[in-house]
């Protein structure tokens, strides 16, 4: 007998955001009467122009779990400075035992990154980057480490303002 599939509100929302589902995991809560199954979902959402967010959702049904994760990702969007479709400089990020190294790449290189990192870069709008993950390959930790590395990105104008110089003085 087929179970009732709940209608998900705002399904297929057309707000110009790119959505990627990274992982759907079946989780179990053991109670006195047996096991309660649920689904935990990890997603990323971005506008393709430097804004990206990560979300987690958990529910008894997969579509509801995905919807919760997408909404959570939309609520947590952060702005990342980009330059010509890549990151402005090298960066390292960590979360738990996961470590991520990011490096800018010339145009035409493409996204050279594994698994969960690739999804983050695609929704962010990065077209050329070289990324390496070290340590844990847990998708959640890799995404958080990628966000940590991206949050360390600064533009030349931000560096100039901190040093009390002009941009021309920094590059000369």
From Swiss-Prot:
GO molecular function terms attached to this record: rRNA binding; structural constituent of ribosome
PROSITE patterns associated with the record: RIBOSOMAL_S5, S5_DSRBD
Keywords: Ribonucleoprotein, Ribosomal protein, RNA-binding, rRNA-binding
One Pfam family linked to the record: Ribosomal_S5
Domain S5 DRBM residue range list: 17-80
BP-aspect Gene Ontology terms: translation
Gene Ontology cellular component list: small ribosomal subunit
Domain of life: Bacteria
Keyword Lipid biosynthesis among UniProt keywords: no
InterPro entries: Ribosomal_Su5_D2-typ_SF, Ribosomal_uS5, Ribosomal_uS5_bac-type, Ribosomal_uS5_C, Ribosomal_uS5_N, Ribosomal_uS5_N_CS, Ribsml_uS5_D2-typ_fold_subgr
Function in brief: With S4 and S12 plays an important role in translational accuracy.
Family: Belongs to the universal ribosomal protein uS5 family.
Assembly behavior: Part of the 30S ribosomal subunit. Contacts proteins S4 and S8.
Domain comment as written in the entry: The N-terminal domain interacts with the head of the 30S subunit; the C-terminal domain interacts with the body and contacts protein S4. The interaction surface between S4 and S5 is involved in control of translational fidelity.
Stored NCBIfam families: rpsE_bact
Protein name: Small ribosomal subunit protein uS5
Underlying gene: rpsE
């Amino acid at each position: 007998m087929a179970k009732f599939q709940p209608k998900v509100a705002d399904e297929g929302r057309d707000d110009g955001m790119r959505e990627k589902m990274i992982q759907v995991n079946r989780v179990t809560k053991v109670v006195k009467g047996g096991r309660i199954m649920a689904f935990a979902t990890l997603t990323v959402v971005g506008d393709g122009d430097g804004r990206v967010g990560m979300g987690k959702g958990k529910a008894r049904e997969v579509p509801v779990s995905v919807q919760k994760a997408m909404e959570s990702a939309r609520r947590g969007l952060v702005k990342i400075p980009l330059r010509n479709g890549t990151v402005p400089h090298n960066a390292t990020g960590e979360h738990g035992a996961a470590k991520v190294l990011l490096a800018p790449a010339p145009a035409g290189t493409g996204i050279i990154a594994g698994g969960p990192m690739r999804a983050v870069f695609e929704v962010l709008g990065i077209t050329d980057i070289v990324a390496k993950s070290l340590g844990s390959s847990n998708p959640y930790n890799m995404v958080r480490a990628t966000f940590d590395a991206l949050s360390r990105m600064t533009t030349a104008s931000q560096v100039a303002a901190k040093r009390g110089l002009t941009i021309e003085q920094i590059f000369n």
